[in-house]
Amino acid sequence: MPFITLERILAHTSFFLLFFVTFIYWGKFLYINIKPITILGEISMKIACFFITTFLLIRWSSSGHFPLSNLYESSMFLSWSFTLIHLILENKSKNTWLGIITAPSAMLTHGFATLSLPKEMQESVFLVPALQSHWLMMHVTMMMLSYSTLLCGSLLAITILIITLTKQKNLPILTSYFNFPFNSFIFKNLLQPMENEILSYKTQKVFSFINFRKWQLIKELDNWSYRVISLGFPLLTIGILSGAVWANEAWGSYWNWDPKETWALITWLIFAIYLHTRMIKGWQGKKPAIIASLGFFIVWICYLGVNLLGKGLHSYGWLI
């Protein structure tokens, strides 16, 4: 079987597995919680990670260079990074709710690479002389791993903000619960006539318990967001430094203020501020989450926005 055919089979199969996993995790979050299906989702994520790993190894073997030379390969590597982070976090935290964030991230990134990019961009190409360097693996790998970890940490921070916005709103919680058809029937026919009693002392205790559980969830999200970003920041630092050394070898200058370099520096500064507020100022919860949420958009601008729309040494020139 030709390598290109095997690559396509692995790419499309892994995408559908990630789509299936995303459906399971979100289905479990919204309404369905069947243990065998949850286990099937966990197994499917492991298989998807294995398939993407195999895809990257085959691409590496057939092209003769590490598969990070174009947007398609880097997007596939980013998707693989999301699946790896998912498996690590799920194993460390023993919580399946993290898959609500990581599974869609892997699926959407994979879908962008597999379904959106033109066929000519998905083909393996020979490296230009400037990229034929041992720094390719070091620099680009560190940058892509930092992107995936920082994006996951930022998504956890965004989740904190969403939960915080509803933390003190008890009635919307009740309303959202009764949005399901069967529960809505119970509410309208059995509970609504007792509207005055619905806010009784016991009900208020239930709401207090809900807010306590939300407070616990916010603390756990805040902890994992901090830990993941703390991992991504040194990876980003190593990626920028190795890129500077590589740039000096290739172009004779450590820093050229290329759009990619500029936005990488902005990304570094945003997450440096985040870590400063956590480690030095002792901030927790909403305030650092706002900074990390800003970092989420900055990372995407740095990775895709500059590459696709900007002009410079790192531009893929697809949209312009």
From Swiss-Prot:
| Binding partners and assembly | May interact with Ccs1.
Q: Which residues cross the membrane?
A: 14-34, 37-57, 68-88, 97-117, 143-163, 228-248, 263-283, 289-309
GO CC term (a single one):
chloroplast thylakoid membrane
Q: Where in the cell is it found?
A: Plastid, Chloroplast thylakoid membrane
HAMAP family under this entry?
CytC_CcsA
Keywords carried by this UniProt record: Chloroplast, Cytochrome c-type biogenesis, Membrane, Plastid, Thylakoid, Transmembrane, Transmembrane helix
Species assigned in the record? Marchantia polymorpha (Common liverwort)
Molecular function (GO) terms for this protein are:
heme binding
| Role | Required during biogenesis of c-type cytochromes (cytochrome c6 and cytochrome f) at the step of heme attachment.
Task: Indicate what this protein is called per its UniProt record.
Answer: Cytochrome c biogenesis protein CcsA
Listed PANTHER family: CYTOCHROME B_B6 PROTEIN-RELATED, HEME EXPORTER PROTEIN C
InterPro entries xref list: Cyt_c_assembly, Cyt_c_biogenesis_CcsA, Cyt_c_biogenesis_CcsA/CcmC
Chief place where the protein resides: plastid
